[in-house]
């Protein structure tokens, strides 16, 4: 099972710079260990306010209690609060192994983004129209994955909610991509631009 974890760190007042550097170094080493074990999949930095220390992580664990043990093993946990969102498989989640080397999906991109979709079908919409729109959405997802824009999709807790991981040149490029989705007229979208985290286990070419 996969999880999105929002990790917010609050360094206690009076903590020395040396202590902060020490725990950050141990955190980086532990992150490498967890990545090697297949538990830590990705790390990103979301937009931050001045003096804010927050990280988004994609983790894998067999069950909730195992994830808690994983998070508790990270040195920064003593200063950190974690918000965990369990993620379920999505039928349109791209199969990363089908991408060919040298394709746009394997090239370096400028930016990554997370999106949260909430789909609300208007009352009275015929079932046939819903089925047709969902089928076209699946086709479009495959096209965007083949072009390297759509990386992952997961179901989130709550009706009609989906988490997506995307590649685009910039925010305007992402908005153009999202506008091409057949379900766009029925969905609200929350977008989070991501920047590189130094301990992200993903290769630079992902």
Question: Where would I find each of the regions flagged by the language model?
Answer:
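Conserved, structured core segments of small domains
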Residues: 1-206
């Amino acid at each position: 099972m996969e999880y999105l974890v929002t990790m917010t760190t609050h360094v206690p007042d009076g903590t020395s710079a040396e202590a902060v550097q020490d725990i950050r170094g141990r955190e980086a080493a532990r992150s490498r260990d967890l990545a090697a074990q297949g538990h830590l999949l990705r790390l990103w930095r979301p937009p931050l306010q001045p003096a804010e220390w927050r990280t988004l992580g994609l983790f894998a664990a067999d069950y909730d209690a195992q994830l808690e043990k994983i998070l508790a093993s990270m040195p920064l946990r003593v200063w950190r609060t974690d918000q965990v969102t369990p993620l379920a498989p999505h039928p349109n989640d791209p199969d990363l192994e089908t991408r060919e080397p040298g394709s746009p999906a394997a090239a370096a991109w400028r930016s990554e983004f997370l999106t949260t979709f909430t789909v609300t079908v208007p009352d009275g919409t015929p079932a046939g129209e819903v089925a047709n729109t969902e089928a076209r959405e699946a086709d479009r997802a495959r096209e965007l994955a083949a072009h390297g824009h759509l990386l992952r999709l997961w179901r989130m807790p709550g009706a009609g909610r989906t988490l997506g991981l995307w590649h685009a040149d910039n925010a305007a490029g992402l908005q153009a991509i999202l506008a091409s989705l057949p379900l766009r007229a029925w969905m609200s979208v929350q977008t989070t631009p991501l920047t590189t985290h130094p301990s992200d286990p993903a290769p630079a070419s992902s």
